From Swiss-Prot:
Entry's cofactor comment: Binds 1 Mg(2+) ion per subunit.
Residue sites binding Zn(2+) per the record: 74, 76, 89, 92
GO biological process, one term: DNA-templated transcription
Name the UniProt record assigns to this protein: DNA-directed RNA polymerase subunit gamma
Protein source organism: Prochlorococcus marinus (strain AS9601)
Amino acid sequence: MTNSNLRTENHFDYVKISIASPQRIMDWGQRTLPNGQVVGEVTKPETINYRTLKPEMDGLFCEKIFGPSKDWECHCGKYKRVRHRGIVCERCGVEVTESRVRRHRMGYIKLAAPVSHVWYLKGIPSYVAILLDIPLRDVEQIVYFNCYVVLDPGDHKELKYKQLLTEDEWLEIEDEIYAEDSTIENEPFVGIGAEALKQLLEDLDLHQIAEELREEITNSKGQKRAKLIKRIRVIDNFIATNAKPEWMVLDAIPVIPPDLRPMVQLDGGRFATSDLNDLYRRVINRNNRLARLQEILAPEIIVRNEKRMLQEAVDALIDNGRRGRTVVGANNRALKSLSDIIEGKQGRFRQNLLGKRVDYSGRSVIVVGPKLKMHQCGLPKEMAIELFQPFVIHRLIRQNIVNNIKAAKKLIQKADDEVMQVLQEVIEGHPILLNRAPTLHRLGIQAFEPKLVGGRAIQLHPLVCPAFNADFDGDQMAVHVPLALEAQTEARMLMLASNNILSPATGEPIVTPSQDMVLGSYYLTALQPNYQKPEFGDNKTTFASLEDVIFAFEDKRLSLHEWIWVRFNGEVEDEDEMLSPQKTKELEDGSRLEIWNLRRDRFGSDNNLISRFVLTTVGRVVMNYTIIDSVSKT
C-alpha cells in the first residue's frame, strides 16, 4: 500500500469472486463520517433536484452517502476549497473531499423483506434447487408466493418437511388444526416467499449432508448417482469457500457508485440517465411501500403481493429478463441490468478488463511484402514515428538536435529528413510484435524487425501468413512495441518469426510455401517443349557462370524458359538415369570429356574434375542462384 498526494494504490496478488454475506454488503455501503455519523443507506428514489440540479439527500445520488459532486465543496456551499479537506459540513452533512470518490463509494438498500438472488435461483443449474433437493418449478412456486412450504410438520400425520401446499390445502389444514375436537398439540409451521426459502437454507447442515451423500453415492448407479454427485459438488464448494447457503437470499442490496450510472444533462435541458437508476428507483419505491404496509398492519394478501413485486424488481435489477416479463423503458427498449453490464462481448470483463486499449500500439491493413526477409515486416513511417516517439525524442535531445521535449515534438510534426534518420537509428534492432485477431494459438503474436516503408499498410512476409491465418483481402493486424529491455530480449529470442518454424500443436512445419510461391517456383523451373536444345559450345547459349546467365536474362538476351549450357562445378541432380556416359572423348591435352545427356564433364589426367557444363533453363539458373545467394548470406 503506498500513499502519496492523496493517491492510493493497491497491489493485489489475485481477485476472488464469491457470494457476499449480508454483513459484507452492509460493510461495502456503510461508512462512518469523521463526525461519527453513520451513512450509506439509500432510502429515497429521487435522483437530482430539477430546480437546483443538485443531488437529493438520501437519494440515489446523495452527496452525504457517495461524496461531493464538485471537488472540495459541500452540498450547501458553506465549505469550498481544498483547505477544508476532511471537514463534515454541520448544515448538510457532506464530507469535503474530491469528487472522484463518487466512482468507488457504494451505498446499500435495506430490504423490508428478504428476496431471492435470481442468479442462484434461475441459473443453470439452479444452486438453490440442487441444495434443497427440490425441483426448480417448486422452488419458484415458493419464492413467487404461489405455494406454501412445510417448514415443520408438527404432529400432523399427513404433512412432511418441505412439502408444498396450495392456498386451499393450507386453509383446510388450518381448519383441521383449530377445530374444537383437534388432537394436534404441536402445530405445523408453513412459510411462503423468500423468507421460507431462507429458513430452509438455514436449516441445512452442509457437513452432515455431505457425509450422508458420500455414503449414498457408493450404493447408487446411473442417473441417481449423477444427481448425487452434482449435489455434493455444490455442497463441497460452499464448504470450501466458507459461504452459507442462506446468503443466496438477500436482506440488503448494494447500490453501485453514482459515477458508474451517471445522469447527464442534454442540450435541450432534458436528462439522459443510466438504466440502472430506473431499476434502482423501482426497487426503492416498492421497498418503501412494503415497509409502510407492514407498519400499518395491512392485510396479508396486500403485503404478500407487495413482497412479490419487490422480488420481481430486484430480479430485474440483477438480471432483467431472466424471469418473467422484461422491464422496458422508452421506445419499448429492455432496460440494461447489472448482468447485462458484466456479461458478453461488450461487457465489463471482455471489453474493459481483458480487452483494454494499450499504449504504444496501433493497427493497420496488411499487404504482402515479398522482398522482406522472414523476420522483417514493413512498418509505415507515419505509424513508426508515433509508436517510437519517446525513443525519438530522447535521441533528439541526447544528440543536441533540440533542447527540450516541446521542441522535439514540433520537429517530429514536420517529419523532415533529420527526424527520419533518428527514427531509422531507433528502430534498428528494436523488435515489434504483430498480432492478428483472433489469437487462437501462440503463433498469433510474433516478433519482427521493422523496416520503414511508405504508404499506410503494414507489409508482411507471405511465409508467416499460415501461422497468423492471414490473407491479404483486407485483414488488419495490431502492432505493439515492447518497451523494457527484458521484453525486447524475450521478443527477439522467443517470438521472432524465423524462430517459429514448427507448429506448437502438431510439431509439423507451419512455415510452408503456398499459392503464388508454389506457382512461381513451378513456372520458373518448368520445361517448355517447344524450345530447342542448343548444341554444346554454341557461343550464344553457353555461359561461364550463373552470374553471366543472370546478366544476359536481365539484358533481355535470354527468355525465362530458354535452354542454355552453363558452367557449374557443384553437385548436380539431373534426369540422367544412365550409369555411364553416352560417350567419352580423349582430348589433346590429356584430359577426358564425358558426354552425358544433360551435362559435359571434363576430367584431368589425375581424374579430378576440371569443368562441368550443365544443360538447363534460364529459370532454373535464377532459382538456384537465388537459393545459393540467400544461403551464403545467412
